[in-house]
Amino acid sequence: MEFSVKSGSPEKQRSACIIVGVFEPRRLSSIAEQLDKISDGYISALLRRGELEGKVGQSLLLHHVPNVLSERILLIGCGKERELDERQYKQIIQKTINTLNETGSMEAVCFLTELHVKGRNNYWKVRQAVETAKESLYAFNQLKSNKNELRRPLRKMVFNVPTRRELTSGERAIQHGLAIAAGIKAAKDLSNMPPNICNAAYLASQARQLADSANSHITTKVIGEEQMKELGMNAYLAVGQGSQNESLMSVMEYKGSSDKHAKPIILVGKGLTFDSGGISIKSAGGMDEMKYDMCGAATVYGVMRVVSELQLPLNVIGVMAGCENMPGGRAYRPGDILTTLSGQTVEVLNTDAEGRLVLCDALTYVERFDPELVIDIATLTGACITALGNHYSGLLSNHNPLAHELLNASEQSGDRAWRLPMTDEFFEQIDSNFADLANTGGSGGGAITAACFLSRFATKYHWAHLDIAGTAWRSGKTKGATGRPVALLSQFLLNRAGSAGINNDD
């Protein structure tokens, strides 16, 4: 689907369809009022007859409205005007796209950017409309023999902005929205792949393909088990030693800064392409969803796609820490003590607490790049789901300014995160009688103690941890990857690059 932006009055639009809003109870938006006036009250007369109440999710398609140049007008219910929030705005856009496709519209001019969403400007409304529109069209059917392609005739959407001076920000919003939507799609496609296809070698192949794409400014290095042994990444290696699939760490390096002394921002993603739990094996129910234990790595891949697409003036390194946790005669055991790359020793109390063992060595490895900051992304703990449900990603950090930046980006993007504490009491829970620390902290505060563990390997730089166990995928009828937190991290990097126009209200 193509997107563009223009500034013009509704009565002058020669389009297949104009999209305008109606509020509860049967109250026309300002643009709808203009069209109603031109049509000599045709639209308001329909509303008085009860054709449309204006609730979110309702719609009414009008054909050949008197004195209106466009062939059709699509009225979209927007709920109560004063209660319109970000979530409802996205629902309205999704309903609009679905309705246009159902009714066979090939192109349309959208005036829903006139809607007032508190604290949000036209850049935000256009960008979110693009991202939401692309999201509503997503389907993962690559592995189906009968793809049953959905009818999607809509080819072009034009967003109207109030004044010509807002055209530039509108065009930038479309550019950013398309790049982020493509990054989210890439992350979802990678996450949804089954584990018999998507293993660490598959992750590495995707990283190499990204580097080989035109003008990517990315170089990829893949570190295999032999090199890991030489380096001393024993915790990472232990997790994968029960699997027949080799553990591989893919390092994607993007150089976009003109400052040759600029330090890189580093993203490290947990890439457990399947997590059986190992010897501490999981229960059978829902184990198929453990293919999603690599969503952190998929997020890193998606964000690197965004960075490359937008050619951000930053240096960014993305690490996909790929491996598979399986039981077997060579698998690591509860009771093992591992010497990590940092030299710290870890007592294994539970082989299903494996993500932190992979990440701890990856976090030590990236010290060599002298990073500006490091953010790790991981489907790390069920405890985070207990604490925050499926709505917020957990955020923990050793640096308050970095945490605040990420929270700001989460609020701007609508890809929400919530900060959890890391205090001395939680660190005490990961003490071990036999090693420097244990890989679990017992009952209570599991998301926090996992982050405390990781922080012990992130002492030489500013660091943040995003626990996406509750937000990376959906279960049930709508099962599938969400692509989160690609939008959050993309916004964070846009802010760092000074490229975002999302902060100020109109």
UniProtKB/Swiss-Prot annotation:
Pfam families recorded: Peptidase_M17, Peptidase_M17_N
Keyword Magnesium in annotation: no
GO term, biological process aspect, one: proteolysis
Gene3D superfamilies in the record: Leucine Aminopeptidase, subunit E, domain 1 (3.40.220.10), Zn peptidases (3.40.630.10)
Binding, Mn(2+) 2: K270, D275, D293, E354
Note on cofactor: Binds 2 manganese ions per subunit.
Catalytic activity: Release of an N-terminal amino acid, Xaa-|-Yaa-, in which Xaa is preferably Leu, but may be other amino acids including Pro although not Arg or Lys, and Yaa may be Pro. Amino acid amides and methyl esters are also readily hydrolyzed, but rates on arylamides are exceedingly low; Release of an N-terminal amino acid, preferentially leucine, but not glutamic or aspartic acids
GO cellular component terms, semicolon-separated: cytoplasm
GO MF annotation: an example: manganese ion binding
Cofactor dependency: Mn(2+)
EC numbers, comma separated: 3.4.11.1, 3.4.11.10
Record-linked InterPro entries: Leucine_aapep/pepB, Macro_dom-like, Peptidase_M17_C, Peptidase_M17_leu_NH2_pept, Peptidase_M17_N
Location(s) in or outside the cell: Cytoplasm
Active site: K282, R356
Keyword Amino-acid biosynthesis: no
Keyword set, alphabetical order: Aminopeptidase, Cytoplasm, Hydrolase, Manganese, Metal-binding, Protease
Binding site for Mn(2+) 1: D275, D352, E354
Family of the protein in this entry: Belongs to the peptidase M17 family.
Record function comment: Presumably involved in the processing and regular turnover of intracellular proteins. Catalyzes the removal of unsubstituted N-terminal amino acids from various peptides.
NCBIfam families: PRK00913.1-1 (NF002072), PRK00913.1-4 (NF002074)
Protein name in UniProt: Probable cytosol aminopeptidase
Organism encoding this protein: Photorhabdus laumondii subsp. laumondii (strain DSM 15139 / CIP 105565 / TT01) (Photorhabdus luminescens subsp. laumondii)
Gene that encodes it: pepA
